[in-house]
Regions:
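Phosphate/ribose-recognition catalytic cores of enzymes acting on nucleotide-derived substrates
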Residues: 15, 221-348
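Active-site-adjacent structural elements in enzyme catalytic cores
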Residues: 67, 87, 91-92, 99-108, ...
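Classical nucleotidyltransferase
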Residues: 121-231, 253, 309-315
Length: 348
């Protein structure tokens, strides 16, 4: 049975996506692109992977202070994420690409996003150098909001107390936000990944404040789907590791419209695929999506990806998946293969 989305969203920050927001958020790519006009801001720092409800709490505090001080609200994040530099392919799967972080943040009344290149040289600078050269000299930070677990500088030696001391010396205020909790659990990117892996999509949606979304440009595939009555839009997953896999009931956002469908996220082992991709079939849709930018919202997990003994067996399972997804959305059983409807009638 389909869950009630209204029951999931128990936290509604004042900077929600539905709120009126600034038309444009400035993207500053690299420390070398910080200009004198960028001095003077309220700032928060982090990975913002997934831009989840815990991040929302930090951003709400940031925006509140930006209004009070009449200063720009700025988010500093890192590319690659620090663990991707230190751990390589062993780093946790990303929830969001940089573009997806930008899209999420620009709807939250943030004025600037500073993307810092995280390389070995940057990682080895001392905490004091980070504070004095970047926060004070270049950004002129007046107010800093960080999570209660924030660490920085070589060996992660910098912490909230060091920032507080620096604030007293250089004249900026530092606030530590307490971790946002749902059902007594600290909301974190790690917790979101665990729920995604387990297929608990309602829980994921509750922690993110929205459905988990994969975005990208529709590319040409091998067109196997159309040979069995299920043409698909294909998105290459340009990530070292993907955080989610399997078959899902989805909604696809394209050109201001929303279409329900069914999608597979994975390597397609039955047809000897090797690279992860997202293949989505839109219900009752006719049109050409090639080259278009789309967002795929993963609403409900149907099953894990699996390898079938034959292409015929795969086709039959795809038919069952489509039937299950339509049922989850409460859609009529139209435009399904007659053989599948006959099987359903027999089973009933």
């Amino acid at each position: 049975m389909r869950a009630d989305p209204a029951s999931w969203l128990i936290y509604n920050p004042p900077i929600s996506m539905a709120a009126t927001h600034k038309a444009l958020m400035e993207l500053i790519r690299g420390i070398h692109n910080i200009k004198p006009r960028h001095r003077g801001c309220v700032l928060t720092i982090g990975n913002f992977d997934g831009v989840h409800q815990g991040h929302h709490a930090v951003l709400a505090r940031l925006q509140e202070k930006a209004v009070q001080l009449e200063l720009p609200a700025c988010v500093m994040l890192f590319e690659p994420q620090p663990l991707e530099l230190f751990a390589g392919s062993a780093a946790p799967a990303r929830l969001s690409r940089l573009r997806e972080k930008y899209e999420a943040l620009k709807g939250m009344q943030i004025d600037r996003m500073l993307c810092v290149r995280f390389n070995q040289r940057f990682a080895e600078q001392s905490p004091n150098s980070f504070i004095e050269q970047l926060l004070v000299e270049k950004l002129g930070v007046r107010y800093l909001v960080v999570g209660d677990d924030f660490r920085f500088g070589k060996g992660r030696e910098g912490d909230f107390h060091l920032l507080e001391e620096a604030g007293h010396r250089f004249g900026f205020e530092v606030i530590s936000t307490q971790s946002f909790q749902l059902e007594r659990q600290r909301v974190s990117s790690t917790l979101v990944r665990e729920a995604l892996k387990a297929g608990r999509m309602a829980e994921v949606e509750m922690m993110l404040g929205r459905p988990y979304t994969i975005s990208g440009r529709v590319a040409h595939g091998d067109k196997l789907g159309r040979t069995i009555g299920f043409p698909t839009a294909n998105l290459a997953l340009k990530r070292q590791v993907i955080p989610v896999g399997g078959v899902f009931a989805v909604e696809v956002l394209c050109s201001g419209k929303t279409f329900p469908g069914v999608a597979n996220v994975g390597v397609r082992p039955t047809v000897h695929g090797t690279q992860a991709r997202l293949e989505v079939h839109l219900f009752d849709f006719s049109g050409d999506l090639y080259g278009q930018q789309v967002k795929v919202l993963l609403r409900h997990k149907l099953r894990e990806e699996q390898k079938f003994a034959s292409f015929t067996a795969l086709k039959e399972q795809i038919e069952r998946d489509a039937l299950a997804a339509r049922a989850w959305f409460g859609l009529p059983l139209l435009n399904l293969p007659s053989t599948l409807l006959e099987k359903k009638g027999t089973q009933d």
